[in-house]
Amino acid sequence: MPHVRSAAVNILVPSGYVNDPAGMAGMANVLSEMIQRGAGKLGNKELSLAMDAIGLDRNCSAGTNHLRIWGATLARNLERSLDLFSDIIQKPMLPKDELPAVKQLSAQEILSLEDEPRQKVLIALKQRHFGSPLGNDRRGTLEGIKAITHEGLKKFWKKHFRPNGTIISVAGNIEWKPLVDQVEKYFGKWKQSECAAPKQQKPEGGYLHLAKDTQQLQIGIAYPSVPFGHKDYYSAVGAVNVLSGGMSSRLFTEVREKRGLCYSVWASHQNFKEVAAILCYAGTTTQQAQQTLDVTLSELAKLSKGIKEEEVRRLKVGMKSSMLISEESSSARA
């Protein structure tokens, strides 16, 4: 991308929340914060200052299968960014005295969900549909956070932070050969190790009602779809776009615009390596809940009857536009 002056780095380490130890749900999320609190020869404050000194916009978070470390800066500071990230990944201090504060932050994040009923419903929906560990929430549980120890954290890092399974992507104003040399310089001595994949449990499925005394009501629906790599994957993604691809989509038009049944309604395609699902959400009132559910289910059922040429053209334009716009951003491409 010679037309930009920035560079973005995206590093995925195979240490996602599906690997959280039994009884310690939230371990990966806690670790994503702890590795930023000092690494290599730099303590917590010094590490933050070093990254700020090169204008490194960064983030670290636990995903499903991977822990993601991301950063964007001026292209001339790329090598320094790789240097700092390599220490965060391979030489984190994991200071014991910082763990209580990090655990407290994680617990507060879980407790804050009580004020976000939409999030609570979606978390329960994924757990019910996918089962453990795929359907687990990255935040973990209060019991799991409480059970995390410093020794357990170090063991988790040592076991799951490994080069085999790690993905490093870089985009921006870069030159290939120097980049390869820099990655080799900072990550070349990282030793491989083996780790068994977590065993997926059978999901419960069925219906679940979460009682809460409120005037609002949240509806979540999930049903199986096809994962990336399947011959019908793009057809499934296209179908979701017809349902929920903007203000002209079917759900928005039929549920919200025509009938005024809810303040929010959408559908999305949730994709994992071997399984996938279409998730639907509607936020409405207790008085209009049944009609909202009925109309939403009706629109889902209508998909089997096909879509119009106009809808096909619209979703193609939307998907192409999204891809082209993202190509102009080094962060999005990384």
Please provide the spans of the model-predicted regions.
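Charge-rich, well-structured scaffold segments of protease-associated domains
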Residues: 46-198, 209, 227, 257-334
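Active-site SXXK
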Residues: 25-37
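Generic solvent-exposed, charged/amphipathic alpha-helical segments
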Residues: 32, 180, 184, 239-240, ...
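Short, conserved beta-strand segments within well-ordered enzyme catalytic domains
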Residues: 8-12, 31-34, 59-61, 68-70, ...
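His/Glu-based metal-binding/catalytic segments typifying zinc-dependent metallopeptidases
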Residues: 1-17, 25, 194-250
